[in-house]
Regions:
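C-terminal outer-membrane/trafficking sorting elements
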Residues: 5, 835-843, 847-917
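Inhibitory N-terminal propeptides of secreted protease zymogens
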Residues: 28-167
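Protease zymogen maturation seam
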Residues: 108-123, 137-219, 227-233
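Acidic-leg catalytic submotif of subtilisin-like serine proteases
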Residues: 143-146, 198-271, 284, 288, ...
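Extracellular S/T/G-rich loop segment that most often corresponds to the catalytic His/Ser-adjacent loop
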Residues: 224, 407-488
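Subtilisin-like peptidase catalytic core
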Residues: 225, 247, 255, 260-366, ...
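C-terminal subdomain of the subtilisin-like protease fold in secreted/lumenal serine endopeptidases
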Residues: 238, 342-347, 357, 390-392, ...
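Recognizes extended acidic, P/S/T-rich segments that occur
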Residues: 573-617
Length: 917
């Protein structure tokens, strides 16, 4: 049964998208029943990978409503023509040769088989040239078919056995039994006598044998290569179906649905002929579980008895591989063993790595669930009178890929998954790992002298009857053997698989598996200790943890620490449960919080245990609780704490200038954006939006931009995104425009102007110009005769002229956009004494032929008179002068002499003497 072990962090799951779910892929601890989904009843038509699958074979599960159409087929007396029309048509379309039930009906248990839906599973054998995915799609489209999956190839054993002679050694240490090779079975009792091995790196079997050696009423199904049924060290401990042994050949004498199944069954060829596989793998595995002990030959098995009659567990050979490319159904083998007395299912097999299986195949799931629920039971699920246990326990090797990944079927939560160790406590180099592994046992390591596992071999295959092999395949039967000791010792009416599994997974060596293997939380709870399975539950819970310390809290991480506690009756707890939630945790709601487990074995009471938490949310308050749990599931009670992570401030983006960005065919723009992070985190930069004509490079803490007019005329936007390592983002939008350029030009006159001394006038130059919209202009103003007036002009084109001395001059203007050649114009200027006077000037004096009178510009009409020195009026005339501002008098006919000029207008009266030459 799976437990989730906390590794170096609480994984990304601690992001707490929901606090109301489990971190663990685990079924409730009170039962080994499965929780993993991927149910065949799910309507979604998604298919498992077909890599590593057998060509021309599929498993299907039909709907219960369609079962009547298959009854004739089940009886073996009908062809596909008896099936529903559409199904028959689809089967023919893929070249189907025949169908057969995956789980042949056992009439003794028909009711429970139908209740669990195993009668709905069929194997479809069809043209091997057909594409498997297409065939699955074809069958899944049929209304009667509920689910379809490939039949995966079982990985063939690759390790080669190393045969040995079993001549007793004079230097062999004392052993409790007389099997000559027992002293060399270091995996049972390691004295450290082999080079680089460490004393105690074993399963503690010699001490366990003082309590139990195995009983014949315990049947262990060995789903593996065929066992050598003639092996002298195995033949007396084989399961024997007496009805078939004493019955007629070719007849199902015990009416269990299988013919001639004397020692088990061959699921490759579907007959009772058991033969050793090409590597003697099944024989080696069987020997570890239950080779006859104390019989003065060969080796001993974990639960092989003590040499007395009736001692030793019984080995049921469920052959699922044999020669090269030979494979049978592990699911069918498990189903068979559940119906025929086995209560422990030993499985040192898996699927090829290339199959890339990411979920338990549903046929395997159905068989495993069935074995766990019904092994040792009658048709109603009640314990059989002659069975030592109600329900079964399924044990799988973790696999030999040397990888950290979920290897199915072993990774299915309800089974016990076994990893492998070397003779010095380290993880065997080939062993798979993961938080789905439950426990570790010796599997051997060829890099150590005599460091592999010693067990039985088939002489027919290897030339010798004993030899070494390595693998999780060798570790797994140690655990199955220990489970067999548990059932042998405690088995009775009312003893359950839950109790067995609890004892099995709680029987651990004192060593710290996390520290010794280096794979924290990836090698299971610990190293199995056979001697610890007999401990008594005195109902005493572990001591409560005094305090949960929290240090080094950052935005997403924190460090936890606490002191290891003791357990009064068991010495140490087996694990610590850590709970995490954004809600306050209590004893009542702890089960709803995110939680995980940490191995407790190997941490002496008072030793400081530290644990980093990762993947927390920033600026969030978390509530934590921790408890110690012993092997019996008794808990210390919760110790509470809380923490609040630091607030993460987003990065800062700042533009070098806020001016509007405009580019044309003649212009480009350059600017920069500075980025920083208030929390001193690393910032990553991305630029999106318009890319035509936009180039940039990052230099230090600046993004240097250059804009050119590549995109069509229009308005565009660039977005700069700064992201810190925790994902906080800041976005800066930068608009820019592509426009058509127009050089500035004067399109109207500024006129001529008059200003009084000490007075000023203001002109708006900008409206007289034509230019490109949005282009800024610079202005310059200069008076030709600076003694007469001054001129200033601002950035908006407001020209201010101030009179200094009477006279006429001009103001010169220059306007530039910084792109084209500047444009110029001039403004005629007259400086008068006072601009409110009716006449600004009279000239020339003396006059000869004409006399010019410059009037106030506001004058519309004026009366002009000239008097001689004697007072004679020589001119009296009215002039309309609106808009002209000047009157020219012809005076050439006047006699030379002195005269007086008088001007009368709405602006006032004016008198001036002048001389006519």
């Amino acid at each position: 049964m799976k437990q989730s072990i906390l590794t170096l962090s609480l994984l990304s799951a601690l992001a707490l998208s929901s606090c109301q779910r489990d971190l663990d892929e685990v079924s409730p601890q009170s039962t080994p029943q499965p929780t993993e989904s991927n149910s065949p009843s799910t309507p979604a038509r998604t298919f498992l990978s077909t890599q590593g699958a057998e060509a021309g074979t599929l498993y299907i599960r039909i709907r219960r409503s369609a079962k009547n159409g298959f009854r004739a087929l089940d009886a073996g007396g009908a062809s596909m023509q008896s099936l529903p029309l559409q199904l028959a048509k689809s089967l023919r379309s893929i070249g189907t040769e025949y169908l057969e039930p995956l789980f042949p009906m056992d009439p003794r248990f028909e009711e429970r088989i139908r209740r669990e839906g195993l009668d709905l599973w069929y194997i479809v054998h069809f043209d091997k040239k057909q594409n498997l995915q297409s065939a699955m799609q074809t069958l899944s489209s049929v209304p009667e078919v509920e689910y379809t999956e490939p039949a995966y190839e079982i990985a063939q054993p690759t390790g080669k056995p190393v045969p040995v002679n079993y001549i007793g050694r004079s230097d062999a240490p004392a052993a409790p039994y007389n099997d000559p090779l027992l002293p060399d079975q270091w995996h049972y009792h390691n004295t450290g006598r082999f080079s680089r091995s460490i004393a105690g790196a074993d399963i503690g079997l010699f001490e366990a044998w003082t309590k139990e050696t195995g009983k014949a009423n315990v049947i262990v199904a060995v789903d593996d290569g065929g066992i050598d049924i003639k092996h002298p060290d195995l033949k007396d401990n084989l399961y024997v179906n007496q009805a078939e042994l004493k019955g007629k050949e070719g007849v199902d004498d015990d009416n269990n649905g299988f013919v001639d199944d004397i020692y088990g069954f061959n699921f490759i060829h579907n007959n009772g002929t058991i033969y050793p596989d090409d590597e003697s793998h099944g024989t080696h595995v069987a020997g570890t579980v239950g080779a006859r002990t104390n019989n003065n030959i060969g080796v001993a098995g974990v639960a092989g008895g003590d040499g007395t009659e009736g001692s030793g567990v019984r080995l049921m050979s469920c052959q699922i591989f044999g020669g090269k490319n030979e494979g049978g159904s592990g699911a069918r083998a498990m189903y068979y063993s559940a119906n025929n007395g086995a209560v422990i299912s030993q499985n040192s097999w898996g699927y090829v790595l290339k199959a890339n299986i990411t979920a338990i195949p549903q046929a395997d799931k159905a068989a495993i669930d069935y074995f766990i629920k019904y092994a040792g039971c009658d048709k109603d699920g009640n314990q059989l009178p002659n069975s030592p246990m109600k329900g079964g326990i399924v044990i799988f090797a973790a696999g030999n890929d040397g990888m950290d990944y979920k290897s199915y079927p072993g990774a299915y939560p309800p089974v016990v998954a076994v990893a492998s160790m070397a003779p010095n406590w380290t993880a065997a180099y080939y062993s798979n790992r993961g938080d789905w592994v439950d426990i570790t046992a010796p599997g051997g390591d060829t890099h150590f002298p005599q460091g592999e596992v010693l067990s039985t071999l088939s002489e027919k295959i290897t030339g010798k009857e004993y030899g070494y092999m390595q693998g999780t395949s060798m570790a797994c039967p140690h655990v199955s053997g220990v489970a067999a000791l548990i059932v042998s010792h405690f088995g009775k009416k009312g003893f359950t698989n839950v109790e067995c599994q609890q004892r099995l997974l709680g029987a651990l060596k004192a060593q710290n598996i996390d520290a010794l293997t280096g794979y924290k939380g990836r090698m299971g709870r610990g190293y199995i200790d056979a001697s610890a399975v007999f401990a008594e539950n005195k109902k005493k819970a572990p001591a409560k943890i005094t305090q949960l310390h929290i240090d080094d809290v950052s935005f997403t991480t924190a460090h936890l620490s606490w002191l290891a506690v003791r357990d009064e009756d068991d010495g140490l707890p087996v694990e610590y449960n850590l709970y995490l939630s954004t809600e306050k945790i209590t004893e009542a709601n702890a089960k709803d919080a995110l939680h995980t487990k940490l191995n407790a074995t190997g941490y002496a009471p008072g030793k400081k245990i530290t644990l980093p938490l990762n993947a927390l949310h920033e600026n969030t308050t978390y509530y934590l609780a921790i408890e110690a749990v012993d092997r019996w599931g008794l808990k210390s009670g919760l110790t509470l704490a809380q923490l609040t992570t630091k607030k993460n401030n987003p990065p800062v983006l700042t533009r070098s200038s806020e001016k509007k960005l405009r580019v044309s065919a003649l212009t480009k723009e350059s600017f920069s954006v500075t980025f920083s992070d208030p929390d001193q985190q690393k910032v990553s930069i991305s630029v999106s939006g318009e890319s035509r004509g936009v180039s940039y490079q990052i230099s230090g803490d600046k993004i240097l931009f250059s804009l050119r007019a590549v995109a069509p005329v229009g308005k565009y936007e660039i977005t700069v995104t700064a992201t810190d390592v925790l994902g906080a983002k800041t976005l800066l939008s930068i608009p820019f425009e592509v426009y058509t350029y127009k050089a500035p030009a004067f399109i109207s006159s500024l006129g001529s102007h008059v200003v009084g001394i000490g007075q000023s006038t203001t002109l708006d130059v900008a409206p007289t110009l034509e230019k490109s919209d949005g282009v800024a202009l610079t202005y310059k103003a200069r008076v030709s005769d600076g003694s007469l007036a001054s001129a200033t002009i601002n950035a908006d084109g407001q020209l201010v002229i101030r009179g200094l001395k009477t006279g006429t001059t001009q103001v010169n203007l220059e306007v530039s956009d910084g792109i084209s050649t500047p444009v110029q114009t001039s403004i005629p200027l007259r400086v008068v004494q006072n601009t409110s006077e009716p006449v600004y000037s009279v000239y020339p004096i003396p006059a000869t032929t004409e006399l010019n009178i410059v009037l106030n510009p506001a004058t519309q009409r004026a009366n002009i008179q000239i008097y001689s020195l004697t007072g004679v009026k020589v001119l009296d005339r009215d002039y309309t002068v609106g808009g002209i501002g000047k009157v020219k008098l012809l005076v050439k006919n006047l006699a030379p002499g002195a005269y007086t000029l008088r001007v009368q207008s709405a602006q006032g009266s004016y008198t001036k003497a002048f001389v006519k030459k």
